[in-house]
Curated annotation (Swiss-Prot):
PANTHER family named in the record: APOLIPOPROTEIN C-II (PTHR16566:SF0)
Region forming the signal peptide: 1-21
Organism, scientific name: Alligator mississippiensis
GO biological processes: lipid catabolic process; lipid transport; positive regulation of phospholipid catabolic process
PTM description: Proapolipoprotein C-II is synthesized as a sialic acid containing glycoprotein which is subsequently desialylated prior to its proteolytic processing. Proapolipoprotein C-II, the major form found in plasma undergoes proteolytic cleavage of its N-terminal hexapeptide to generate apolipoprotein C-II, which occurs as the minor form in plasma.
Summary of the function given for this chain in its UniProt record: Component of chylomicrons, very low-density lipoproteins (VLDL), low-density lipoproteins (LDL), and high-density lipoproteins (HDL) in plasma. Plays an important role in lipoprotein metabolism as an activator of lipoprotein lipase. Both proapolipoprotein C-II and apolipoprotein C-II can activate lipoprotein lipase.
UniProt gene name: APOC2
Record protein name field: Apolipoprotein C-II
Amino acid sequence: MDLKVVAVSFLLLVLCSEAAGYQLLTWEQANTAVKGVLDKVHSTGVEKLRDIYDKSVDAVGTYTSILTDQLYHWWCGEQ
């Protein structure tokens, strides 16, 4: 619930800060401003998730290779 309040407050801040004088922005201008902010936020979130995914895949790949090597030497022994 707190996240919704923060998001609505942020959107209102963006809309009000883009007002010129006493005139409010038209719907199209407001829509464009909000979409720009949301794209920036979305891109940052996606990049963070992609970075976490890449790091975890690298770690799992390393340990899988080590485990595979150990199982191979345990099963086949030294020949």
